[in-house]
Amino acid sequence: MGATKKPDLNDPVLRAKLAKGMGHNYYGEPAWPNDLSYIFPVVILGTIACTIGLAVLEPSMIGEPANPFATPLEILPEWYLFPVFQILRTVPNKLLGVLLMASVPAGSLTVPFLENVNQFQNPFRRPVATTVSLIGTAVALWLGIGAALPIDESLTLGLFQFDPTVEYKNLSIFYSYI
């Protein structure tokens, strides 16, 4: 063990700092156990009381009651399976759909090998991983939103529709000036 330097209490700069309260805890009692052992149970019991109170005062059903004699028109999975459901619904070949679903984790596992950087580096300085993550998030949101729509609107999310049976009068006015 090395020798530790003892503070020189005759130093006027150190004495001035100590006189102002610098160098030690001067703002009251410690947080543990005095404060936290009181606040933690109060917060936990308050949360439980609010949950029970809201459940008693305003009971709500979890979805619609089941009716075994009426099958819904389209059976949808839980919300977190919407992107997978959309892949299986839109791809005509089911084997291709399963392969597309298997390619998601396989592609995610290859990203660290594409980019040879330090794992503790700033994520915005890892452009391949950042781009793959952003594109994957956008595609998952697009597939998830599309799964909740009818099949004919699912790929375009209902934003772009063209019906050849409808006469578009605004376009005919536009083309008359050309």
Curated annotation (Swiss-Prot):
The keyword Transmembrane helix applies. The keyword Plastid applies. SUPFAM superfamilies: a domain/subunit of cytochrome bc1 complex (Ubiquinol-cytochrome c reductase). It is a multi-pass membrane protein. Its main location: plastid. GO terms for cellular component: chloroplast thylakoid membrane. It is found in: Plastid, Chloroplast thylakoid membrane. The chain crosses the membrane at residues 36-56, 95-115, 131-151. InterPro entries: Cyt_b/b6_C (IPR005798), Cyt_b/b6_C_sf (IPR036150), Cyt_b6/f_cplx_suIV (IPR005870), Cytochrome_b_C_euk/bac (IPR048260). Disulfide bonds: none annotated. Keywords: Chloroplast, Electron transport, Membrane, Photosynthesis, Plastid, Thylakoid, Transmembrane, Transmembrane helix, Transport. It comes from the Eukaryota. One of its GO terms (molecular function) is electron transporter, transferring electrons within the cyclic electron transport pathway of photosynthesis activity. Pfam families: Cytochrom_B_C. GO terms for biological process: photosynthetic electron transport chain. Belongs to the cytochrome b family. PetD subfamily. Component of the cytochrome b6-f complex, which mediates electron transfer between photosystem II (PSII) and photosystem I (PSI), cyclic electron flow around PSI, and state transitions. The 4 large subunits of the cytochrome b6-f complex are cytochrome b6, subunit IV (17 kDa polypeptide, petD), cytochrome f and the Rieske protein, while the 4 small subunits are petG, petL, petM and petN. The complex functions as a dimer. This is Cytochrome b6-f complex subunit 4. The gene is petD.
